[in-house]
Regions:
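Glycine-centered loop/turn positions within well-structured domains
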Residues: 56, 159-160, 287, 313
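Flexible mid-to-C-terminal extensions adjoining Fe-S/redox cofactors in radical SAM and related proteins
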Residues: 287-362
Length: 362
C-alpha cells in the first residue's frame, strides 16, 4: 500500500513498503545495446529532479509558494530507478530541482550514486545544478561524496539586480560564497547559468563576461524558454545567441571553440587571450533537438522525454505496483521510443508543457 508521509525537509515523501535495495542490485549489463530513440539518438544523459521545492522565487520562474507541489521519492527509491537507467546505458546523471540542496540526504544520495558503474565499468559522471544559496557549507561534502561537477544558477552579478530577480534579501552574497567554496573544493569546471530576459537582466551580459575571467568560471547564457509558471514569455523578451555574441564581442573579442561532443547544448567561446570561457544555450533561436541525448525523471518518478512534452510516463507507478528491474527496463526502452523529434516553440499551436521548469527539473 502507498503511504504519504511528511519528510524531515517538509516536502511530501512517497514511501513504499520495501527494503532499501543495495547498489549490487543494479549490475551493469554489457549485453544491452545503447538506449536509442526512434530518431536514432543515443540517450546517455539522465536529469533527475529530487525536489520541486525552492527557496528562491525568481520572477521568471515561480508565481507560487516555496513548498512542494509534487511528492518526492525516498532516497532508496531514487537509487533503484536511477540504477535501472544506468543498466540501460546512462553514463551521466545530473541532480536538479527545484533546489536539490534542500534535500537533507543529498550528500548521501551522491555518495550512493558514486558507487554505480556504467556498462563500460566506468564511474558515472555525476553533476548537480543548484541556486547556490546553501552551497558554501555543502561544496566540500558533495565533492568528498563523489560529485564531479556543479552548475550554479545566477542571473546577475550585482546584488541589487540579483535580489530583484530572486526576491530573497541577501541572496547574492550567499551565492557568491557558494561559488567560491565550490571552486575551492575542486568541483570543476564550475559553470554559472544565467537566464537572460530583455528588460530584466540583459544589462548584465558584459559584466558576466568579465566575471567569467575574474572568477575562473564558465558562464553560460540561456535563452529564456516558455517554461515559467506565469505568462511572462514572449518572443520579444528572448535575448538571442547572436545578440549575446555581438555585444560581448564589442567589449572583449571572442573565439568560438569546437564542440566536445555532438550532443553538447552550448555553443562555446573563449576570449581573445584564451582566459575564461562563456557558453550560449540557444534552444529558441538555434534549437539543438537533433542531437538530444537527454531524458528526465521528475521528483515524483515520472519520465519526461522532452522539456516541452505534454505527456508523462509513470515509472514510479510501476515500481510501486511491484515491477521488477526487467519490467522497469522494458518500460523505459518503450518510453524512449516515444521521445519527440523536436520542440515547437514559436510555432502556431505551441502549448507550454504540463509542468513549469521548477516542477520538471532543469
Amino acid at each position: 500500500m502507498l503511504r504519504l508521509s511528511a519528510g524531515s525537509e517538509k516536502g511530501i515523501r512517497l514511501k513504499l513498503p520495501m527494503a532499501a535495495p543495495s547498489i549490487s542490485a543494479f549490475p551493469a549489463q554489457a549485453s544491452h545495446s545503447p538506449l536509442t530513440d526512434s530518431h536514432g539518438r543515443v540517450i546517455h544523459d539522465l536529469r533527475v529532479s529530487i525536489t520541486d521545492r525552492c527557496n528562491y522565487k525568481c520572477v521568471y520562474c515561480r508565481t507560487g509558494e516555496v513548498g512542494a507541489q509534487y511528492p518526492e521519492l525516498a532516497l532508496d527509491e531514487y537509487l533503484r530507478l536511477i540504477g535501472v537507467f544506468v543498466a540501460l546505458g546512462i553514463t551521466k546523471v545530473r541532480l536538479t530541482g527545484g533546489e536539490p540542496l534542500l534535500r537533507r540526504d543529498v550528500v548521501e544520495l551522491v555518495r550512493e550514486l558514486s558507487r554505480l558503474r556504467t556498462l563500460d565499468g566506468d564511474k558515472l559522471d555525476l553533476a548537480l545544478t543548484t541556486n547556490g544559496h546553501l552551497l558554501e557549507s555543502l561544496a566540500q561534502p558533495l565533492k568528498d561524496a563523489g560529485l564531479n561537477r556543479i552548475t550554479v544558477s545566477m542571473d546577475a552579478v550585482d546584488a541589487a539586480t540579483f535580489e530583484h530577480i530572486t526576491r530573497v534579501e541577501g541572496s547574492y552574497a550567499k551565492v557568491l560564497a557558494g561559488i567560491r567554496a565550490a571552486r575551492a573544493a575542486g568541483l570543476a569546471p564550475l559553470k554559472i547559468n544565467c537566464v537572460l530576459l530583455r528588460g530584466f537582466n540583459d544589462d548584465q551580459i558584459e559584466s558576466f563576461a568579465r566575471f567569467a575571467r575574474e572568477e575562473d568560471v564558465v558562464v553560460r547564457f540561456i535563452e529564456f524558454m516558455p517554461l515559467e509558471e506565469g505568462r511572462l514569455w514572449t518572443p520579444e523578451i528572448v535575448v538571442t545567441l547572436r545578440e549575446i555574441v555581438d555585444r560581448i564581442g564589442r567589449a572583449l573579442p571572442l573565439v568560438e571553440l569546437p564542440p566536445r561532443e555532438a550532443s553538447e547544448t552550448a555553443r562555446r567561446y573563449t576570449f581573445f587571450d584564451g582566459v575564461g570561457e562563456i557558453g550560449i544555450i540557444a534552444p529558441v533561436s538555434q534549437a539543438f533537438c537533433g542531437a538530444c541525448s537527454r531524458v528526465r525523471l521528475t521528483s515524483d518518478g515520472k519520465i519526461r522525454t522532452c522539456l516541452f512534452s505534454q505527456v508523462e510516463h509513470d515509472l514510479y507507478g510501476r515500481l510501486r505496483a511491484g515491477a521488477g528491474d526487467d519490467e522497469l527496463r522494458a518500460y523505459i526502452v518503450q518510453t524512449i521510443q516515444e521521445k519527440e523529434a523536436r520542440h515547437h516553440i514559436g510555432e502556431p499551436g505551441f502549448l507550454k508543457p504540463s509542468r513549469s521548469m521548477v516542477h520538471i527539473g532543469g
